[in-house]
């Protein structure tokens, strides 16, 4: 049986190259590489350069992390430094636990 892994599609909205934006991106990349290496796509959107994208996606504050796929869409606004809160907020931690339990 072939086991296809899900691909996680995420968007990180930042406002320029501020220390807060750089920290959010670095922290997020660490989490994704540790937990979802090879099965994620991350798009970083600078709302100062692309305000229309922020408006279309109803982004009101930065940094905002949005999980697009797999559904449902989830968003985290603000501090991304707490690994567990990020995973829980995006419904990724519980999803992985459920999958592991179903394999038992």
From Swiss-Prot:
Keywords: Biological rhythms. InterPro entries: Circ_KaiB, KaiB-like, KaiB_domain, Thioredoxin-like_sf. The keyword Ligase does not apply. Coiled coil: none annotated. It comes from the Bacteria. SMART domains: KaiB (SM01248). It holds the Pfam family KaiB. GO terms for biological process: circadian rhythm. The keyword Phosphoprotein does not apply. SUPFAM superfamilies: Thioredoxin-like. Disulfide bonds: none annotated. HAMAP family: KaiB (MF_01835). Has 2 forms, fold switches to a thioredoxin-like fold (KaiB(fs)) when bound to KaiC. Key component of the KaiABC oscillator complex, which constitutes the main circadian regulator in cyanobacteria. Complex composition changes during the circadian cycle to control KaiC phosphorylation. KaiA stimulates KaiC autophosphorylation, while KaiB sequesters KaiA, leading to KaiC autodephosphorylation. Phospho-Ser-431 KaiC accumulation triggers binding of KaiB to form the KaiB(6):KaiC(6) complex, leading to changes in output regulators CikA and SasA. KaiB switches to a thioredoxin-like fold (KaiB(fs)) when bound to KaiC. PANTHER family: CIRCADIAN CLOCK PROTEIN KAIB2, KAIB-LIKE PROTEIN 1. The KaiABC complex composition changes during the circadian cycle to control KaiC phosphorylation. Complexes KaiC(6), KaiA(2-4):KaiC(6), KaiB(6):KaiC(6) and KaiC(6):KaiB(6):KaiA(12) are among the most important forms, many form cooperatively. Undergoes a major conformational rearrangment; in the free state forms homotetramers as a dimer of dimers. When bound to the CI domain of KaiC switches to a monomeric thioredoxin-fold (KaiB(fs)). KaiB(fs) binds CikA, leading it to dephosphorylate phospho-RpaA. Belongs to the KaiB family. This is Circadian clock oscillator protein KaiB.
